[in-house]
Amino acid sequence: MLKITLIYPFSADLKDKSIFRFPPLGLGYIAASLKQKGFNVELVDYTFLNNNEAAKKVRDSNPKIIGIYSMFSMKKKSLELAKQFKKNDILLIAGGPLPTLDPADFLKDFDIVVIGEGEVTIIELLNSVEKGKELSMIKGIAYKNQGKIIINPPREYIRNLDELPFPSRELFDNQSYKDYYLKRFNHSITPIISSRGCPFMCDFCSSPVFGKKYRERSPSNIVDEIESILELDYDRVWFADDCFTINRKHLLNICAEINKRGLKINWECLSRADTIDEETATKMRQAGCIRIFFGIESGNDKILALMKKQITKNQAKNAVKTAKSAGLQVGAFFIIGYPGESDQTILDTVNFASKLPLDYLSFTLPYPIPGTALFERVKEKINFPSDDWEESKNWSFIRHKLLYDAGFSEKKLKFAILKAHLQFYIRKFLGKKGYRLIGMPIQKISNFIFVLMS
């Protein structure tokens, strides 16, 4: 059988505590599918290795095929690695969100791009390569033929996710991931998914690009995998679904299965403000959910409508209150500087966010992902070449790039983010009375400064 080495080109300063590091779950699924069919697979994860150490591992694996994962923050690194390992006798394959959205760009440095879900496609592809067959009949790939780019018909979505083998977690550097979290947060966490796809059409999100077809794993299959994770000595899982709480019945069945088996596991998830009620939040807490994150995005209903979020700020406020009442820690994500924003809508969001009883909040600037509606609206205003879209190696809340002409300066938007965090922490640590004495004067002065900034 062919030897394939999968590469996860993550790179960041290990001293930066603001960065969440998770093993490459997608490559874990690919590896498991390949191993199930008898292929020899290795995985090289750059997360805890320097470039020389990782490159040596790749060379020592002596692969005939190299598969490199890429997303928006990894583009430069993935292209550098393609050039580094390119040899006449090595086939280079790209996969992941960014190659899926722009296969032609990656075919400048790669031989083949796997588009979308790759578990079935990679098996057919490697079988064809091994037998010297044509690539024209393989769905879900792009390649070059005599210099011409060929994009084959799309692969159908995998309907029954229970048929997929669990990710090959034995290939992950589990000890390094556990140590990283234990030293910083006193717990060890690793990702899992209960579903794929998202039926919503948020303006800025790449999920609709990959399809709106929402598919679920069975609760028993999910909890079987949680048990296997516990055997690796993790004590927490992160449900990496686009929205874990979409299907209330499915969610409650997962909670019931966890409780039925008596599992001692804490977990976290992403949610939408219109998918949480009191009973659901309480059942989640009883089943080990410790933290929930909402993509609230804006504190202005007009901007929420422009984003196609299909929620209101009142729904967001109630969702946070409901989750907190159930004993959950709550985090929220916000975007400022969106097309159509004004000084007032940004201040609405900043002041709304800082008033919510959150445990964590995160602000970012708009990120125009290729293929999204947001990208189509602003693509003529983009100021950076796509190769330079990576965040700074220091991914603190104030170091985001403004990638296009938003009508606001990057400096002004970063001031708004700083203002939001300052107001939030004053309220969090000094309470309402302290905020009235200290926070309100700061809020009024910073509002005035923000409006005056260009």
Which residues does each predicted region cover?
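N-terminal [4Fe-4S]-dependent radical SAM core
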Residues: 10-12, 138, 144-194
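Active-site charged/polar residues at nucleotide-handling catalytic sites that mediate phosphoryl
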Residues: 61, 232, 356
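Catalytic cores of alpha/beta
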Residues: 104-108, 280, 340-354
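C-terminal accessory regions of radical SAM enzymes
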Residues: 2-14, 142-145, 149, 329, ...
